[in-house]
Structure formats: C-alpha cells, structure tokens
Regions:
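Eukaryotic scaffold repeat domains enriched in small/polar residues
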Residues: 1-257
Length: 257
C-alpha cells in the first residue's frame, strides 16, 4: 500500500502506511447472500456496522463481532409494512435510531430496533424547491440537535436541511461556480449561437456527508480539479477548511482568508 503526504512546497513525500486492511466481510461470509452495489456504510458507538445493500433493497446490520445481526428490508409504519427500494444512504445512532435514505421510495425514514418508522421525510414543499421538484434522497446525516441533512439527486443548490420535525429549512453548503477570466472574456464576445453551445456553469453535486461531535458537516463533492473535493461546513454553511491559495487544501488548523 502506498501512503504519501505533501511537504511545505507541495511535493509528494512517501510515508509509512497509516492504515492497512485487517480483514474483509462479505454477504456470503455473513450467510445473507452477496451484496449488490452497496452505496453506503456507517457505524454506531456500539461497534455495529450498517451497510446500504442498495441493489438488494435492504440494509444489513453487522455486529461488533462481524457476524450478521439483522436485515432490514421492510419497515412498519401506521400498521402497514412497506419494502425498502434502493436504500443509498445511512446514518446510525445505535439500534434505537437509524436513518435511511430510501431513494426510490422518495423518502428519508428514521427507524427503531424493531424496524418501526419513527419519522418520515418525503415530498418536502417550499417556494425555493419549485413545483417540479422530485425528492430523491441519496445520503443522510443528523446532528446533535436532530437536524437532518440530505444530499438529493439533481440538487445543485446545496445540501437540503430539515428541522427536528422534518420540515424543510433550506440549503447549506452551496458551491459557488468558479469561472476563469479567459472563460469570462470569450463569453463576453461570443455570439448568441456560440453561447448556446458553451458549457453550462452549474454547481457540482455533493456525493457524501458525515457530521462530527461538534456539529461540523463534512461533505464530498464532484470536483474535477480535486482542490475542494472535501469540505468542512460550519453551522452557517461556510467551508472552514483552508483553500488552495498559498497552501494546500485540506488543512484544518490554518484557514486562509
């Protein structure tokens, strides 16, 4: 395994491996059948591991001993049972509280240890979302105040936030599009026909999310340059990781302004 870091001048320096694999777990080893396109994994404070087995429409819960603990493929809500459909994101706070981004069912659900639905977020309404908005959650995270953060499909405005009652509260972490001076120059002098064929400058999508104990949101996004692919968002939605201006992006201790 190759492990490296950067020195003061931005040059690669190879280092001893910080982490190496200790073992592997598969659906076959667990006795529940092979995983099919798993899209997320999460752990709780008790050492349980939660796998979003997306292609099999289920969540697999693995105990601290790496043995199968339970499978969640259906949930109970208001006396009715419904099946999960392409669950793609998870956030676990122990067996008593698990959030699932149930993507193809267009909902985020909170379930207890008996697979009973405690809370559902679906079809949020707001003027800022638009009449044609389709809620397809992909990733989910929850902070200490029970605020729910959701990465949704085809949402470029940022991460959707919901209050403790599941009501839409707005966006956070919106990524501003950076246009180079050369691009601005050509856009200014191009014809209408040329502009219609030019690249659309829309923000990139977020791809992953996690929250630390202090309430900071860590989010990854599709950054082709790799300069801001990981962001650390404060409660105001500002990225507080040092940006790549005179130093390397990713430094938590020194933020350049």
């Amino acid at each position: 395994y190759i492990t490296y870091t950067y020195d003061y001048y931005g040059d690669v320096k190879y280092t001893p491996a910080a982490y190496v694999p200790d073992g592997t777990v598969s659906g076959t080893n667990l006795g529940c059948g092979e995983f099919n396109s798993p899209q997320d994994i999460n752990t709780d404070d008790e050492g349980n591991i939660y796998v979003a087995d997306t292609g099999n429409n289920r969540v697999v819960v693995i105990g601290p001993d790496y043995k199968l603990k339970r499978i969640i493929d259906t949930v109970n809500e208001d006396g009715k049972t419904s099946k999960l459909s392409s669950p793609s994101g998870l956030y676990a706070e122990g067996d008593e509280k698990l959030y699932i981004a149930d993507s193809e069912n267009k909902r985020v659900i909170e379930v207890d240890e008996n697979n009973n639905v405690i809370k559902t977020i679906s079809n949020p309404k707001s003027d800022s979302l638009g009449d044609d908005f389709v809620f397809t959650p992909l990733k989910v995270a929850v902070d200490y105040a029970d605020r729910v953060y959701v990465i949704a499909k085809n949402q470029f405005e940022g991460i959707l936030t919901f209050n403790e009652n599941g009501e839409f509260a707005g966006y956070t972490g919106t990524i501003n599009v950076q246009i180079t001076p050369i691009e601005k120059f050509w856009k200014k002098f191009s014809t209408k026909a040329q502009r219609s064929k030019q690249q659309l400058y829309i923000p990139t999508e977020f791809t992953g999310i996690e929250i630390d104990d202090a309430g900071f949101v860590y989010a990854t996004n599709k950054d082709s340059e790799g300069e801001q692919s990981v962001r650390r968002l404060n409660p105001s939605g500002d990225d507080v990781i040092q940006q790549k201006t005179t130093g390397l992006s990713g430094d938590l201790n020194w933020k350049l302004t």
